[in-house]
Amino acid sequence: MGPENTLILIDGVPVTSRNSVRYSWRGERDTRGDTNWVPPEQVERIEVIRGPAAARYGSGAAGGVVNIITKRPTNDWHGSLSLYTNQPESSEEGATRRANFSLSGPLAGDALTTRLYGNLNKTDADSWDINSPVGTKNAAGHEGVRNKDINGVISWKLNPQQILDFEAGYSRQGNIYAGDTQNSSSSAVTESLAKSGKETNRLYRQNYGITHNGIWDWGQSRFGIYYEKTNNTRMNEGLSGGGEGRILAGEKFTTNRLSSWRTSGELNIPLNVMVDQTLTVGAEWNRDKLDDPSSTSLTVNDRDISGISGSAADRSSKNHSQISALYIEDNIEPVPGTNIIP
């Protein structure tokens, strides 16, 4: 399955910024996914969940789950400054340069600790003529990207068994256009943008969260409240026919705004009923609100479609969804190394 069916988590929290980008009629999105919000130097580990074990995360995880675990605040002061570059052998391929810092340590003994990191990253686009032309058209190479990230966590240890984390972050991602079009429908406009390395789309992401983790005599608990806001600013594109996805003339931008609220709670209870097993009980509530004036700007001959007006002037650009869920999972280990998960 493609990336749209793979759920990305950062520290167990879903990241949904890519949902601010419209689907094409082929079921694809022109996005960089949601894996590039954390610099590699701040990743503690990555957990991958595949197959039936990903079912409890919902339909958006049909292709699996990738959980990016970041480094925790430390009880002693530590700091780092990292510089990285990757220079391809071919000068026509985009080079990467990255600089980031991190600072972690106690604010009030072991009871209150913090972690702060910042990141600047730039990967250049491939040369617009890196591939041999087919007829009169050049096949585009990889587009480039510019990243700016800052993120902070304050961790409050209420007692040895309970930790309360407060997190806030801000990120900006912008592309460096290389000439790619949805249906290979390039034009003089797209070729000019590629040759000049223009930025044709950018994402601004804010995230805030409060998470409580507890260790009890009977098991472990996790409860969290989260808010994520994404502004997706893109050059106007064609919305239908062979020109769908092709950047239009004039270099005019439209901004889509996505807001997501999430609340989740989970209990993990070890049991020994005939065999070792872990019972997981959880609940989740999500609300998403999208204002998409770009995708809803197409007029279809002033005809209604399933009760929705075909005229852009007569329909709202705002949509929302709300999802509530309960789940129960039992991880049974009849013999070491073999798990049964009903």
Feature locations, PLM:
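Short beta-strands and strand-coil junctions in structured, solvent-facing domains, enriched
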Residues: 5, 15-17, 53-56, 88-90, ...
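Transmembrane beta-strand segments of Gram-negative outer membrane beta-barrel proteins
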Residues: 43-45, 64, 70-89, 114-115, ...
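Face-selective signature of the C-terminal outer-membrane beta-barrel domain
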Residues: 155-173, 199-342
